[in-house]
Amino acid sequence: MEILVKYENGFRFSAECRGYTATTGQGDDGKKERDGMWPAQLFEASIGMCIGGYIAKFCREQGIAYDDMTVELSRHIKTVSSGTKPSGAKISRTTGIDAQIRLGAKLSQEQRQGILEAADNCHITKSIEEGLQIVCTLVDVEANSTLKTI
């Protein structure tokens, strides 16, 4: 197991990985200091941090100052009614993300191109672009069996 996600309360979950913990959502216990971004926001922030990491690596290798770098993300969301879900619930998804990269350093055209290529190499965006498959299984603790989604 690489990451363990645990329900806390309300709509708050925590994820543990390599000794680090991230918290998402809001609990109903009044402990606002334990609340965090919603999971979709954390997902999108992860993309920005991944892009930033690849740019930082490129800038370090090229001797380009990047201490003041920011990556500003704007997301596009699509919401549709689900005709296939029994509840008829609305389903939303992020359909696109615009990332604006800001660096204070004076850059040549070649450096600009290199930075954009580095940004495009982000592991998360490459995984999404190539088609990320997620398989959910439900473990029946009492029966000690596993059910996969269809």
Please report, for each region that a protein language model flagged, where it lies by residue:
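Extended beta-strand/beta-hairpin segments
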Residues: 1-45, 55-150
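Alpha-helical metal-binding/catalytic segments enriched in His/Glu/Asp
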Residues: 50-51
